[in-house]
């Protein structure tokens, strides 16, 4: 006849892993297939968007008319087709490139500069290169699997452990 307490529910919620989870802070699920030199890109990407109101407004203008069906379509198809996923009048890569530019603007506006004179946009460089080459981190791994690794999955662990 025990009843769950608030602390019990708090504990249970830590076992759920949605794309975004609201805690004392906003927790966003990380990219699953990135290398060590790409790992700082995702938090920088979100920082550029979420910490700049103009950038948030720009992103809102892009997505405000997306229906639930649109979002479900992307959720279902992006893992299969990646950046080549057809969406609206283009492909997912078109949206990714646009969002990257918005994030770069947000980081530039934020103006957090290192002692070496670099702002946080430096962390987006690998994402920018990937998008210029029409490749996601998963695409790069698939290419290595098919071409360099002789279709052996073992090398993924050797090259991507950190």
Name what the model sees in each region.
Residues 1-162:
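C-terminal accessory/tail domains of diverse enzymes
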């Amino acid at each position: 006849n025990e009843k769950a307490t608030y602390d019990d529910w708090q504990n249970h919620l830590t076992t759920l892993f949605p794309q975004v989870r609201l805690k004392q802070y906003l927790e966003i699920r990380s990219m699953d297939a990135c290398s060590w030199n790409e790992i700082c890109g995702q938090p920088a990407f979100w920082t550029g968007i979420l910490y700049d109101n103009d950038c948030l407004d720009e992103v809102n203008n892009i997505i405000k008319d997306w229906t639930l069906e649109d979002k479900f379509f992307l959720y279902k198809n992006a893992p299969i087709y990646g950046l080549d996923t057809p969406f609206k009048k283009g492909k997912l890569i078109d949206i990714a490139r646009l969002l990257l530019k918005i994030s770069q603007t947000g980081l530039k506006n934020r103006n957090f500069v290192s002692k070496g004179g670099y702002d946080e946009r430096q962390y987006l460089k690998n994402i920018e290169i990937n998008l210029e080459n029409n490749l996601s981190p998963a695409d790069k791994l698939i290419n290595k699997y098919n071409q360099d690794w002789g279709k052996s999955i073992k090398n993924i662990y050797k090259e991507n452990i950190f």
